[in-house]
Swiss-Prot record:
Cellular component terms per the entry's GO annotation: chloride channel complex; endoplasmic reticulum; endoplasmic reticulum membrane; Golgi membrane; membrane; nuclear membrane
Organism ancestry: Eukaryota, Metazoa, Chordata, Craniata, Vertebrata
Name listed for the protein in its UniProt record: Chloride channel CLIC-like protein 1
Cited InterPro entries: Chloride_chnl_CLIC-like (IPR009231)
Record-stated family: Belongs to the chloride channel MCLC family.
Record membrane topology: Multi-pass membrane protein
Disordered: region residues: 398-553
Length: 609
């Protein structure tokens, strides 16, 4: 097929145009390549070592004075600037070439060794694989804590040390095997297992240490304290019971509070379904209204909202008052022992009667019941007599000892009545209890006149007192004759005692002398008023050592008061029994004569007139 001339001409023009475009594009590429491939040695700041081309400068092209600015090719000026110093450039080139050779030798030596990077890549991949089984951190959990066991053998340790010491003997396979066996058994971190425990440090349980310490403390308390030998067992049991009862109150209160708290939690769960209805979050429909009407009309159920707010507002601690704890403690104190005793008796009877025939079970049961009743009755009687000590039949109740420095009030004898004399002075009634009260009532005139020979021994008694205060004298205590009181056994065991003179005896003697002077003045005044005319008759008196004084109260059954005075003297540390006179009237300081009351250094007996 032949083409027309016009079509052939158009085709030629199109081919020419296409060739022209190809030539121009090739020219542009060559120019651009040459432009970008050219490196300015004076502008190394804009040199990019990665692409090995010059960066395009952002500086303005109008600055002609910048030395590092790459000059554009100017057709008008084709002169190439010469190097200012050729030798200096050559010198720098040699230095750079030398440094380049050194770096090349180092890199060659490094590349000659086996590369350990793949080993650590495999180790890290294994680590991530094991931890991914337990869970990896994500957006919800920023960090996770894992636990793993480290297994290290001798060969693995040697390979790791070779790598750390930069030795050439280590290999990639040995290192890979060593790292793969280090971390085994991955698991999540257990915080409780890592807490400090007393057992891990001291290898002993805390409970064992506390029990041993308590036993040692009890032993030390028993050895050191003296209460076990002084206080009676009944008093110790009573104190222990009081302490146990107080501890039981607190114990039961905490127990009741825990029970109330647990009940409160259970009620909260039960009334949770009424939350929306009682708080108004849910509107009541016709079914709820119908059920509410049925509850109020036909049932006796409480309002669920009332129960809901009671559970919500009332604190469980208010449900356990102290009175409730006291009541339950007393109830448990009475019922729990009986319950345990009944269980023990039941098990005992069951074990006793199970192998006996029926004919013997009834007699054995009766005997066991009688034995239990007798034991309970005897224990109750002993406890009652221990708590409340009733006076025995035929014995008089023991009177409490008088206070320190206080005289016991005189008592009339049972067979005598008070004397009647009107307003006139009458002699004090004579007590036959002991010699102390017998001599203590000598302030009365009648008694003084009856015992005039003894009142003449003033000087001799003063000598005896001075002798007693300057030396140690054995004191002998006499035991009353007749019916003895059980508590007087200690006086018979302490018949001979040695008394040391000291500050207490000297102070007592001074007080006695002062009181004697006052009593002597009163006695002299009364004696002058009632003095008899037959005063000049001879007086015969025995020396003090031979005075025979018989205890009056011993034969009259008043030994109880003597024992009481001895106890009182022993409790207050007084080793000397000094009997003082009782002042019956006011003292007169201007009387010249003085008389003294009797003070006995040795217990003597007085003849009964």
């Amino acid at each position: 097929m032949k083409l027309s001339s016009s079509s052939s001409f158009g085709l030629c023009i199109l081919v020419v145009f296409f060739c022209f475009v190809v030539i121009e594009s090739a020219k542009i590429r060559i120019d651009g390549y040459n432009d970008e491939a050219w490196i300015d040695p004076y502008d190394m700041l804009n040199y990019d070592p990665t692409t090995k081309r010059m960066r395009k400068s952002t500086e303005s092209e109008s600055y002609q004075n910048v030395p590092t600015k790459r000059r554009e090719f100017n057709s008008e000026s084709c002169d190439v600037p010469k190097c200012p110093d050729e030798h200096e450039c050559i010198k720098k080139l040699h230095i750079l070439q030398k440094e380049f050779d050194e770096q090349k030798s180092k890199s060659t030596a490094t590349l000659s060794k086996p590369v350990c990077l793949p080993v650590f890549k495999r180790f890290l991949s294994k680590l991530l694989k094991e931890t991914s089984k337990l869970g990896l951190p994500d957006d919800g959990i920023t960090a996770m804590h894992y636990d793993a066991e480290v297994k290290l053998s001798k060969q693995s340790l040697a390979e790791i040390q070779k790598l750390l010491n930069d030795e050439d003997g280590w290999t990639t396979g040995a290192m890979d095997e060593a790292l793969s066996q280090i971390l085994v058994q991955f698991k999540l971190h257990d915080y409780e297992a890592w807490k400090w425990r007393f057992e891990d440090t001291f290898h002993v349980d805390v409970d064992t240490v506390l029990k041993v310490s308590l036993i040692v403390l009890i032993i030390v308390a028993i050895i050191c304290t003296q209460l076990w030998s002084v206080v009676s067992w009944f008093v110790q049991f009573r104190r222990m019971f009081a302490v146990s009862f107080f501890i039981s109150l607190i114990w039961n209160w905490f127990h009741l509070y825990m029970l109330a708290f647990a009940e409160h939690k259970k009620n909260i769960v039960q009334v949770e379904s009424f939350n929306a209805k009682c708080t108004g979050l849910k509107q009541l429909n016709w079914q709820d209204s119908l059920s509410e009407w049925y509850r109020r009309t036909w049932t006796l159920q409480d309002d669920p909202c009332k129960k809901y707010y009671e559970v919500l507002v009332v604190n469980p601690i208010l449900l356990v008052p102290p009175t409730k704890a006291i009541t339950i403690t007393i109830t448990n104190f009475i019922t729990d022992p009986l319950k345990h005793i009944g269980e023990g008796i039941s098990e005992f009877l069951r074990a006793l009667l199970k192998d006996l025939p029926v004919t013997l079970q009834i007699p054995v049961l009766i005997i066991i019941i009688l034995a239990i009743l007798i034991f309970v009755y005897g224990s109750a009687q002993a406890a009652i007599h221990q708590v409340a000590r009733f006076p025995r039949l035929g014995w008089r109740q023991e009177q409490p000892p008088p206070a320190v420095g206080q005289r016991q009030n005189p008592q009339l004898r049972a067979h005598e009545e008070p004397w009647e004399g009107g307003d006139a002075r009458q002699p004090l009634p004579m007590r036959q209890d002991n010699r102390g009260n017998h001599v203590g009532n000598r302030g009365d005139q009648g008694f003084r006149d009856a015992n005039a020979p003894e009142n003449r021994e003033e000087d001799r008694s003063m000598d005896i007192r001075q002798e007693f205060s300057t030396k140690r004298t054995p004191v002998e205590t006499l035991q009353a004759t007749g019916n003895t009181f059980p508590d007087d056994e200690t006086d018979s065991q302490q018949r001979t005692q040695e008394l040391d003179s000291g500050a207490n005896v000297e102070e007592e003697v001074k007080v006695e002398e002062k009181e004697k002077k006052e009593s002597f003045s009163v006695d002299n005044k009364e004696q002058k008023e009632t003095k008899s005319p037959d005063r000049s008759e001879p007086i015969t008196s025995e020396p003090p050592s031979s005075i025979d004084v018989k205890t009056v109260g011993a034969d009259q059954g008043n030994e109880h008061l003597m024992c009481t005075k001895r106890k009182w003297a022993a409790q207050n540390g007084f080793k000397l029994q000094v009997i003082l006179c009782e002042i019956n009237s006011e003292a007169s300081a201007d009387l010249p004569e003085e008389e003294e009351c009797f003070s006995f250094k040795h217990p003597v007996q007085e003849t009964q007139s």
